[in-house]
Amino acid sequence: MNGHYHRSNKGGGEWEFFNLPNTWQINYGKLVFNLQPFKFKHTGLFPEQAVNWDWFGEKIKNAKRPVKVLNLFAYTGGATLAAASAGASVTHVDASKGMVTWAKENAAASGLSDAPIRWLVDDCVKFVEREIRRGNKYDGIIMDPPSYGRGPKGEIWKIEEKIHPFIQLCTQILSDDPLLFLINSYTTGLQPAVLSYMLNTELVKKIGGKVEAEEIGLPVSSNGLVLPCGASGRWEK
């Protein structure tokens, strides 16, 4: 074990390290990610998302046409880089300037500095509302919404209240021939069955396609089990 995170009953916590550098890199295929630990437990990457990167990467490659992807609450850009490396043009939106800078550094480390990626520091809800007014459309939408957050101008996000209306909003910027819609959840109240219900209600009932929702996790080498890490809901034509 290289490090252990100790939670505090006052919120947050502290890392205890064992022969671990302050920063390091990790590779997934051709993608390179810069990692460092933070007091809120994150290290800059959710590796369990690799199963989703593989899924939508194949869909983008097999589309045999230009694909525009919108990545919302995009964090340090794992999904952005996976989509761009598969050939998509990507719009990356996150409310944190620091996270967008980190994502750009990951793109540079992955040799994707010149990839067609648009980097935006913005409130995701307000951005989608503006895209509706502009008439912009996307073939794929990916989102990894936090349980709670604030936009760059103090906008409050509470996932239990906001997520279903936000999915409804996002369906208005899907293209006439959409390819995929992915939503990830690390919130206890948004389990696979809930994600499936929302995607079936807002997408399948209106434009067809199919939905798959399941838990995602990381394999544990010491016991052969899978450590649950969250849930994903996928829609595809």
What is each model feature region?
Residues 169, 174-181:
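Short glycine-dipeptide loop
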Residues 64-75:
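Conserved class I S-adenosyl-L-methionine
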Residues 1-47, 54:
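Non-catalytic substrate-recognition/targeting regions of SAM-dependent transferases
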